[in-house]
Amino acid sequence: MHHLLEQSADMATALLAGEKLRELILPGSQDDKAGALAALLLQLKLELPFDRVVTIGTVLVPILLVTLVFTKNFAEEPIYCYTPHNFTRDQALYARGYCWTELRDALPGVDASLWPSLFEHKFLPYALLAFAAIMYVPALGWEFLASTRLTSELNFLLQEIDNCYHRAAEGRAPKIEKQIQSKGPGITEREKREIIENAEKEKSPEQNLFEKYLERRGRSNFLAKLYLARHVLILLLSVVPISYLCTYYATQKQNEFTCALGASPDGPVGSAGPTVRVSCKLPSVQLQRIIAGVDIVLLCFMNLIILVNLIHLFIFRKSNFIFDKLHKVGIKTRRQWRRSQFCDINILAMFCNENRDHIKSLNRLDFITNESDLMYDNVVRQLLAALAQSNHDTTPTVRDSGIQTVDPSINPAEPEGSAEPPVVKRPRKKMKWIPTSNPLPQPFKEQLAIMRVENSKTEKPKPVRRKTATDTLIAPLLDAGARAAHHYKGSGGDTGPSSAPPAASEKKHTRHFSLDVHPYILGSKKAKTEAVPPALPASRSQEGGFLSQTEECGLGLAAAPTKDAPLPEKEIPYPTESALPSGGPFHVCSPPTASAAASLSPSSLGKADPLTILSRNATHPLLHISTLYEAREEEEGGPCAPSDMGDLLSIPPPQQILIATFEEPRTVVSTVEF
C-alpha cells in the first residue's frame, strides 16, 4: 500500500515537472510570431563589438579631439601679438595677420633662412582629421568585401540551427518514444541508451547537408583572411599618426616667438634701418599637446587590443559558441574539420554568437547544454520520450491524463504481489477551452431553464398609439371576415355545450394574429395536450358572447338610430370604432346570467339562416380601448402556465392592469336583427 501511494505521488510530480519542461523545450507557434517580429525589428550585425570598439578608438575619438581644437580657435584669437603703443589699429591687425601666416621665430644673430618654424601648431588639427579618415579605410573595406558573403552565410546558419533543433524535438523523438514503449515497462537503462545511440546513426538528408556545409567552412579561410587583413591594416596605418604625433609632442614645445615685421615705415626712404620685431604667443599649443598625447596613448592601446584578439582567435581559442551545442540536437561537430584555427568556422561562430537574437530556439539549446549532466546525452529525445510515455496528449498546455488512486474497496492486509495491482484509474476528462472575451470565469447556465424563466416573466404593458382614420376603416373589415368564417364553421356542425372548449382553444391559438392592439399575455409557451383548460363562461367568451338587442336594453345602452333600420341584407360598412382583436381574454360588458342562459337554450342553438349569420356577425361589438383589462385566466379557466413552472420561479397571480386610458366617450355599435 505504501509503495503504491509513493508511486502515485511520483507520477504526479513527474507530470507536473514534465509539463513545465515541455513548455520550455518544445517548439511552438509562438516561435513563428517571435521570429516574424524579430525579422522586422532586428537586422543582422556584420560587425563584432570588438570591431566597433576599435573603430571608435581610431576614428571617432580623434575626430572629437579635433573638434575641441577648432572650437577653441573659433571662440578666441589663435595668436596674440604685442605691438608697440604707437601702432594704429590697422597696423596692429596687419601685424597679427602677418605673424600668423609666417610663424617663424626671428632669432637675433641668425640668418633668416635658418629661423625655426612653428607651422606644425597650425597644421595639427587638419592632420588629426586626415588620420581619422585613414584609420576608417579598413572598416570600409571589410564592409564592401565581406558583407555580402557574410550575410548569406549567417542567414543560412541561423535558420539551419533552428531547423536542427525542431527536427530533433519533433522528428526523431517520436521514433525513440515508440521504440521505448514497444519494450514495455521492464526496459532497462542500457536498452534505452542503445535505442538512442541507434537513432543517432540515422541522419536525415538535411542533417547530412548541414554537416557537409560545416565541414567545407572548416576547411576554407576566405572570411578569416579578410578579417585578419582588416586588423593588420589597422596596425600598419596606425604607425603613421603615432609617429607624427610623437614627433610633434617631442619637438613642438614653444608657444612664444618673435615675429620680424621689417623696416620701420618712418625711416628714410632707401635706407636699411633696424627691423621692427613683435612678440607673439599661441594660446592653443598646450591644448594641442594634450590632444596629441591622448591620441598616441589611444592608438597604442587599440593596437595592443588588436594583437591580443588576433592571437586568441587564431591560436588559443577552442570554443565555437553555438556550434558546440549542436551535438545535443544530432549534429556531430568533428574536430578534424578544422585543420587549423585559421578557418571560417571561427569567424562565423563569433558572428552567430553576436546575432543570437535571431535564433528562436537558443534558450532551449542553453537549457539542454546546462542540464546535460543530469540527464542522458540526448536530453531532448529522452525527455520527450518520457513525457510521451506518461501521457499521450496533442495539446501542449492542457493535459487530459488520468490520476491513479488506490482502490478504497481492497483489503489492506492483502499482500502487494497480487495478480493485478490494486489501482483504480479515474476516467479521463477532456478539458475544453471555451473562448470568451471576459477573462473572468463564466457561470454555467442551463439554456432550458433560461427559456422557461423568460417565457414565464410577465410583460410590461406597452403604450398604445392612437389609431388613425385608415386603421379605423380597414381593421374592422379584415377582422369581420375572419370572425364570420370562424362562426360559420362553428355553427355548421354540432353546436352543443361540448363545443365551448374548442372555441376557447381556437381563441387561444389565434390570439397572437390579431391586427389590432395585442393584449397582455402571461406566457408564450403552448399548453400541454393532456392539460386541457376548462371552457370560458359564455358571458365572457368573445366568440359567442355578442350582445343582443335585449341585453343592450337591459344594460341601458343606446340602440342604433331608427334611420339605419331600413337597411336589409346589408352590413354596416364603416363602424364608428375599430373592432377588438379576435383573440385575447378581455372583459366585455358582461350581460346578466339569465341572458347567458337564454342564449344557450336549445332553441337558439339551431342552425341559423346564412343571411342572419352575416347580419349578426359581420362586425365585432366595438368597445373603446379604455375598457381593455387583463383577464384572470386562473379563475376563469383560461390558458395558464405549465405545471413545472413553479419549480423554477414563483410568479404572482396576474392583476387587473389598465393598458391605456383615454377621455373619449365610449360608443358601442351593434347590428340590427331583422
UniProtKB/Swiss-Prot annotation:
This is Pannexin-2. It is a multi-pass membrane protein. Belongs to the pannexin family. Glycans are attached at N86. Residues 394-426, 485-510 are annotated as: Disordered. Residues 394-408 have a biased composition (Polar residues). InterPro entries: Innexin, Pannexin. It comes from Rattus norvegicus (Rat). GO terms for biological process: cell-cell signaling; monoatomic cation transport; monoatomic ion transmembrane transport; positive regulation of interleukin-1 production; response to ischemia. Residues 11-53, 147-230, 317-674 are cytoplasmic. Expressed in the eye, thyroid, prostate, kidney and liver. Abundantly expressed in the CNS, including hippocampus, olfactory bulb, cortex, cerebellum. Not detected in the white matter. The lineage of its organism: Eukaryota, Metazoa, Chordata, Craniata, Vertebrata. It comes from the Eukaryota. Structural component of the gap junctions and the hemichannels. GO terms for cellular component: cytoplasm; endoplasmic reticulum membrane; Golgi membrane; plasma membrane. Forms PANX1/PANX2-heteromeric intercellular channels on coexpression in paired Xenopus oocytes. Does not form homomeric channels. The modification Phosphoserine is found at S590, S601. Residues 75-125, 252-295 are extracellular.
